[in-house]
Structure formats: structure tokens, C-alpha cells
Amino acid sequence: MSSPKVGFVSLGRPKALVDSERILTQLRTEGYEVTPEYNDADVVVVNTCGFIDSAKAESLEAIGEAIAENGKVIVTGCMGVEESVIRQVHPSVLAVTGPQQYEEVVRAVHGVAPPRQDHNPYLDLVPPQGVKLTPRHYAYLKISEGCNHRCSFCIIPSMRGDLVSRPVGDVLSEAERLVRAGVKELLVISQDTSAYGVDIKYRSGFWNGRPVKTRMTELCAALSELGVWTRLHYVYPYPHVDEVIGLMADGKVLPYLDIPFQHASPRILRAMKRPAFEDKTLARIKRWREECPDLTLRSTFIVGFPGETEEDFQYLLDWMSEAQLDRVGCFQYSPVEGAPANTLDNPVPDEVKQERWERFMEHQQAISTARLSTRVGREIDVLIDSVDEEGAVGRSSADAPEIDGCVYVDSEQPLKAGDMVRVRVTDSDEYDLWGERIA
């Protein structure tokens, strides 16, 4: 008897990718075969993203493609909270579940394509690390669900709820399994990594027989014992973040912080319902770099937020010149259904949003170009991501996968994905580095 086959598509950010991995791991444990071909599958699961309108449009398009090619489609993920919208566009979907409803997704799959009764999970073992959708040498490590912030442009709390931290022992045990399976880089993710443990008052859990506090600093210290790269994403600049800089300076955690500042104008930050301490943030960035000179700072910003004036925007550009961030993403404000910001006065015209976005990107490109040029001549560690006929492409400690730059490596000896090599940097541009392997 052949195993039932499930087609799967995962949309959205890394946090959604981790949800997809969890669903796929459960299905594989029950004997399902995962196939990339829709027309070869007994059912297709679409894990959607519903954060902004463009993501919703992409999700609806993906659902439509799956229906056209297969006909039997189950929808899950963030957009699942808008079941009426999905069914209005695609009334033939078999089931719709929301984010984090893993068991409901699996039950829906059972209803369409029941698992084999003769499946023996002890003979058809799933890898200890579970099913991963990333390359073998890096993996996302989700430490919590939900968020306690109520930013006016965001609907994540209404979709995913308040912050719920995973037990620290579970997180560290998963990290151990990943490292044993060959992972060389752990990317710590959540909606708010720096708030880890606040919902349970930072109570201690146990890992390898010893207590570990459920708190970002203690988690990072424990992860450093695994001997692989640990990269922190989605960190808010709370005071205790200063403690992690010491771990970075000591080489225990990658000197990389992904902090979603979103803006710099105090007036706009208040409208966004975000902390408006841009002057203190600049002072802290200066202290962080004094303690850890190799620190890389990444952030994302929104331009064209309702009420943003030219003065607010210029304030942001001036702040960027002072902050000298290394890696930056920027988005034009887009209304999100259900977000409080939709009701704010003085929306910014689309042509002004576009013009400000272009000026912002040009401004930051100059900063990025200058900062990367200082790396020429230095020796850095590079984790190889891919190799083809043109050479090897990897990342340094300053580069997260998918969102940051790359290091193009010239090597006389063959390389493969997952190799960690020493490289002397020979050239740079706005986003990337080039170098020669020296060890």
C-alpha cells in the first residue's frame, strides 16, 4: 500500500516557515509523503501569510494555483483568521485553520487522505531534528509565539495572541538535536525575542540537569555552549539587551542584532505606538559598538506612515546618518485590514511614499557602501550556502540568510554548502563582499 501524498506551500516570513516544518514533521511521522508536485498529491496544504495586503493577495493566488492543479486544498496560517475572505474567493477549499493550529491542519489532512493503517513509525523514522525546509547547515529556532506590543500598524497580536514563551528546556533540547544533525547556524526568532520569558516571570527551566532561566541572556549563554553560530532576530532595545553585547564581544553569540526600529521621529513613533527614545537609542548604539566593535546592526523602517511630514522624514534620514546601521530594509506604509493605523488622519499620497522610499534607499546605500568598504583587507569566517560553476557563495557573521548580503568566495580547493572557511576580503559594493579563501 502506497503512502498518501501531501503537497505543501509555505508563504511569509521565517516564523511561518517554522510552523510549516512542525506540520510537515507530524505528517511525516504518520507516514505521509511530501511531494513538490500538486498534481501528484492527494491533498495540498497552503500555509498563508496575511500581514499586509500584498501578502494576502499572494496567499489567495497560491490557493488558486493549488485548486487549479489539484482541487483538494487545505488553508492554514495567518490569513486563516479571515476564513470568509478566503471562501468568498475560493469557495471550494476543504478546510481553513488559523495560525498555530497544527493539530487542526493534521486532522483536516486525515479527513481527505487518511494515514496508512500499517505505517510503523519505528521503521520509517523521521530525522531527530524533524522535517526542515531550510538548507541542512542552518535552521530557525522559534522561542515564543505571539506578542504583547500593540503597534498601530500591526495585527499580529489579533492573529497570534499575546506572548507565550516556549519552555527553555524544550528550546535548548531542540537546538541540540539540530546541531547533532549538522546545523552550523541557529537563527533565533519570535515576534519579540528580547521579551522571552516575561510572560512566565523568567522562571527557570531545566536543561541537561541544570536550571536555566527563561530569559534571552541566559538562553544565549546556553546556546553558546553548542559551538555553532547563534544569530538573534526581532530584538527590541530593552535595557537588558545590553547584557547580550558582552556575550557577542566574547565570541559566544554572533555580533549581530536585528532590531525593528521602524522610524526615528518621536511623533511618528508615538503614532505607531512604539517606544520613542531615539536619542537614547543612538547613545546605546554608540556604547554597544564601543564594547563590541564588530557588531552588525540590521533594522527595518516604514516610510509614508499616516501623518508623516517632510520634517519627520528628514529627521529619519538624519538619524540614519548618526546611527550608521549596517543592514536596512524599508517598506512603504500599506494599510492592513483591522490595524488601528487605518483610522489615522493625513494619509501620505502614494507618489510621496514612493519618492521618500527612493530617497531613503539611496541614503542608506551610501552608508552601507562605506561601511562594507572598511572590511576590505580583513579576514573573516564565511559559512558557504551554495556552490555552482561560477564559484561559492556564503555569508559572514554580518549576513542573515535571505535578507542580507553575500560573500562571493574564490577558492582553489573545492567547497560545498555547509563548509566554514576563512576568507580575506578583496572587494565590496553596496551589499556584498568578495574574497579569497585562505583556510
Swiss-Prot record:
The keyword Cytoplasm applies. This is Ribosomal protein uS12 methylthiotransferase RimO. It comes from the Bacteria. It comes from Bordetella bronchiseptica (strain ATCC BAA-588 / NCTC 13252 / RB50) (Alcaligenes bronchisepticus). Residues 4-114 form the MTTase N-terminal domain. It is found in: Cytoplasm. Residues 133-370 form the Radical SAM core domain. CDD domains: Radical_SAM. One of its GO terms (molecular function) is 4 iron, 4 sulfur cluster binding. Gene3D superfamilies: Methylthiotransferase, N-terminal domain, Nucleic acid-binding proteins, tm_1862 like domain. Its EC number is 2.8.4.4.
